[in-house]
């Protein structure tokens, strides 16, 4: 089974957690694109979706899935999204696709976070994948200096503008032993919109695409 086939298997497996007549929170990325394809098969059974990015919104609209503004929705039963890394505590690094802020907002609203990945995303310690931080453009140099003090190597992601009009700094060479603490520390830096650590609000259910099929992990 190829990596993309494992992503597809995980994406389709998430369909079992979608309730009829509900509004579904939908994330961003290659694995989520498979989930969106799956969700389209039951678009007449759900009310619609809330999207975490312009890219996912476009794909869902093209498939005929109604997309709602989060401000018009009081609750979401599930949020389905991928991860760049996830550990055994269900802490994640997300934001490789630069949609981390909106992803974090939608995840905060949802009752249940379903994380869908292929088995290459499971790690013991977070940090091999660079940690993305969304930053107000004028604060770029200041935030980078503060990240160096925390032990990271900040790199400006050239040519990347988020859906919110901000920039991304990717932090390399950090072994993240205490994800919740670091998430809070980075979010406390003036000029940071948010960072790609999802530890305060981690995943509730993990669906892992493997060569043997989809494995379900709960914490």
Swiss-Prot record:
InterPro entries the record matches: NagB/RpiA_transferase-like, Ribose5P_isomerase_typA_subgr, Ribose5P_isomerase_type_A
GO biological process: D-ribose metabolic process; pentose-phosphate shunt, non-oxidative branch
Pfam families: Rib_5-P_isom_A (PF06026)
Keyword Isomerase in annotation: yes
Catalyses which reaction(s): aldehydo-D-ribose 5-phosphate = D-ribulose 5-phosphate
Active site positions: 103
SUPFAM superfamilies the record matches: D-ribose-5-phosphate isomerase (RpiA), lid domain, NagB/RpiA/CoA transferase-like
Binding site for substrate: 28-31, 81-84, 94-97, 121
Single GO molecular function: ribose-5-phosphate isomerase activity
Pathway listed: Carbohydrate degradation; pentose phosphate pathway; D-ribose 5-phosphate from D-ribulose 5-phosphate (non-oxidative stage): step 1/1
EC number annotated for this UniProt entry: 5.3.1.6
Repressor keyword on record: no
Keywords of the record: Isomerase
GO cellular component: cytosol
Class of the enzyme per the UniProt entry, highest EC level: isomerase
Family, per entry: Belongs to the ribose 5-phosphate isomerase family.
Subunit-structure text: Homodimer.
NCBIfam families named among the record's database cross-references: PRK00702.1, rpiA
Biological role: Catalyzes the reversible conversion of ribose-5-phosphate to ribulose 5-phosphate.
Protein name: Ribose-5-phosphate isomerase A
Organism: Shewanella pealeana (strain ATCC 700345 / ANG-SQ1)
């Amino acid at each position: 089974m190829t990596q993309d086939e494992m992503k597809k298997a995980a994406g389709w497996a998430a369909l079992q957690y979608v309730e009829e007549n509900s509004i579904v929170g939908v994330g961003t990325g290659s694995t989520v694109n498979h989930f969106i394809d799956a969700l389209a098969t039951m678009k007449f059974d759900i009310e619609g979706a809330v999207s975490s990015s312009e890219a996912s919104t476009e794909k869902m609209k093209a498939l005929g899935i109604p997309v709602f503004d989060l401000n018009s929705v009081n609750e979401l039963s599930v949020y389905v999204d991928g991860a760049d890394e996830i550990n055994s505590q269900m802490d994640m690094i997300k934001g490789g696709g630069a949609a981390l802020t909106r992803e974090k907002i939608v995840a905060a609203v949802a009752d249940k976070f379903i994380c869908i990945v292929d088995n290459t995303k499971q790690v013991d310690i977070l940090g091999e994948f660079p940690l993305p931080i969304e930053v107000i453009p004028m604060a770029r140099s200041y935030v980078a200096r503060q990240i160096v003090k925390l032990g990271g190597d900040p790199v400006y992601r050239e040519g990347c503008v988020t859906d919110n009009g901000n920039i991304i700094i990717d932090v390399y060479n950090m072994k993240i032993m205490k994800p919740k603490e670091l998430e809070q520390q980075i979010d406390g830096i003036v000029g940071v919109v948010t960072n790609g650590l999802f530890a305060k609000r981690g995943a509730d259910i993990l669906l892992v695409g493997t060569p043997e099929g989809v494995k379900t992990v709960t914490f």
